């Protein structure tokens, strides 16, 4: 995300991230598996 901010600038980076839900972002950009994302969600909701 920080690379995108530096490369695109604030406005373009925000537009990129507004298009994604957190789940979509973690799956596509973070290269995390669906079970890994679920585990993160479980931990964060505690």
UniProtKB/Swiss-Prot annotation:
Its EC number is 1.4.3.2, 1.4.3.25. Coiled coil: none annotated. It comes from the Eukaryota. Its cofactor is FAD. Its main location: secreted. The keyword Secreted applies. One of its GO terms (cellular component) is sperm midpiece. It is found in: Secreted; Lysosome; Cytoplasmic vesicle, Secretory vesicle, Acrosome. Glycans are attached at residue 31. GO terms for biological process: adaptive immune response; L-phenylalanine catabolic process; L-tryptophan catabolic process; L-tryptophan catabolic process to indole-3-acetate; negative regulation of T cell activation; negative regulation of T cell mediated immune response to tumor cell; negative regulation of T cell proliferation; positive regulation of regulatory T cell differentiation. This is L-amino-acid oxidase. It comes from Mus spretus (Western Mediterranean mouse).
């Amino acid at each position: 995300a920080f690379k995108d901010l530096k490369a695109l600038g604030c406005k373009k980076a925000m537009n990129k991230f507004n298009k994604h839900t957190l789940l979509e972002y973690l799956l596509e950009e973070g290269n995390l598996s669906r079970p890994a994302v679920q585990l993160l969600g479980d931990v964060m909701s505690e």
